[in-house]
From Swiss-Prot:
Domain of life: Archaea
Alphabetized UniProt keyword annotations: Ribonucleoprotein, Ribosomal protein
PROSITE patterns assigned to the protein according to its UniProt record, in alphabetical order: RIBOSOMAL_L29
Gene3D superfamilies in UniProt: 1.10.287.310
GO MF terms held by the record: structural constituent of ribosome
InterPro entries with a match to the protein in the record: Ribosomal_uL29, Ribosomal_uL29_CS, Ribosomal_uL29_sf
Name of protein: Large ribosomal subunit protein uL29
Record-linked NCBIfam families: L29 (TIGR00012)
Length: 69
């Protein structure tokens, strides 16, 4: 299930970075499964990459907002 940007914006930076770490580990596992041929849903790699991009976008927004203060 894709992450909602509104939910991500409500999180603080620490939570976002923790979630980012989780997704990066998940992506690594999915890639290994893909190479081994045991991955059934190949779209999950694409969805995980998009979730990572969403989190990085929100982290960038929050960083810019804090820099302006």
């Amino acid at each position: 299930m894709p992450l909602e940007v509104d939910e991500l914006r409500k999180m603080d930076l620490k939570q976002l970075k923790e979630r980012l770490n989780e997704l990066e580990m998940q992506l690594l596992k999915l890639r290994v499964e893909s190479r081994m041929g045991t991955l059934k849903n190949t779209a999950s790699i694409k969805n995980t990459r998009k979730d990572i991009a969403r989190i990085l976008t929100v982290i960038g927004e929050k960083s810019k907002k804090e820099a302006k203060k």
